[in-house]
Design a protein with these regions (language model features):
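Glycine- and charge-enriched loop/helix tracts that form the active or gating conduit
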Residues: 1-96, 150
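Long, highly charged low-complexity segments enriched in Glu/Asp and Lys/Arg with interspersed Ser/Thr
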Residues: 169-210
Length: 246
């Protein structure tokens, strides 16, 4: 069976609303070791039973939200599977000497490269997965962030996928989803970039000033109005000759 076909089946399982039960069955039948050996190996190494593991909790949360009608991108589904294998997502915000975003992206890509090649992730799905996992630390404690910082994150192209996974992770860990509600409210009320509330265009940094309107030549003195231009008087319209030569 081709790797593309295997990935299609995995995505179907994760979107079925019964992914926790199905993946647990695959794990105990040793089929998961053939479909996704990295995941099965991680469970074996940590002595986890899938149902009670962090992965099992995420799958249960995923099924709960799927049953309510939620739809997921492939990037979110991959994040549910591989979050434990990419530990960069666990770095706490504001910790001692936190790694830079570039370092997180580099580390995550290095871990996922061999996995993505073997399982034949598309380039887009791999990039989505890396962005989702490495951005998770930014979603903690939104109430303590300035509005400008919240809006900047909401404008990122990966924001919605990353927030979807953040919600799944919160439910899986038994954490309140109040922070998720704050983020969604900010996103709904996000002002259009470069526009004030009154609709006045805001000049962005580095943007050239608009050209000043040209002054009319020989303007009228202050307090006076310029004389109106005289309309050219047109004579009577000439009728075409209709007579013929005799």
């Amino acid at each position: 069976c081709s790797t593309a076909r295997v990935m299609e089946e995995i995505y179907k399982i994760l979107r079925s609303g019964a992914s926790a039960l199905t993946m647990d069955t695959l794990y105990h039948s040793s089929l998961l070791a053939h479909l996704a050996p990295e995941i099965a190996g991680h469970l074996d190494a940590h002595g986890h039973d899938l149902a009670s593991s962090p992965l099992g909790n995420r799958l249960t949360a995923l099924d709960r939200l799927t049953s309510s009608g939620r739809i997921w991108t492939n990037g979110v589904l991959l994040a549910v599977l591989f979050s434990d294998i990419v530990p960069v997502s666990a770095h706490p915000p504001g910790g001692k000497n936190p790694p830079s975003d570039d370092r997180l992206l580099h580390d995550a890509a290095g871990i996922l490269d061999p996995i993505s090649r073997r399982m034949n992730f598309s380039r887009l799905n791999k990039e989505q997965l890396v962005r989702i996992l490495t951005s998770q630390r930014k979603f903690a404690n939104p109430a303590k962030k300035p509005p400008q910082a919240l809006q900047a994150i909401c404008r990122k192209e990966y924001f919605r996928d990353a927030l979807d996974f953040f919600e799944i992770a919160c439910l899986a860990s038994g954490i309140s989803t109040d922070d998720v509600a704050i983020w969604r409210e900010v996103a709904v009320n996000l002002p259009r970039p470069g526009v004030q509330r009154r609709g006045v265009r805001v000049r962005r940094k580095g943007e050239a000033r608009p050209a000043e309107p040209k002054q009319a030549e020989n303007p009228a003195p202050s307090g006076e109005t310029a004389p109106a231009k005289k309309k050219r008087r047109r004579g009577p319209r000439r009728r075409p000759r209709t007579d013929t030569a005799e």
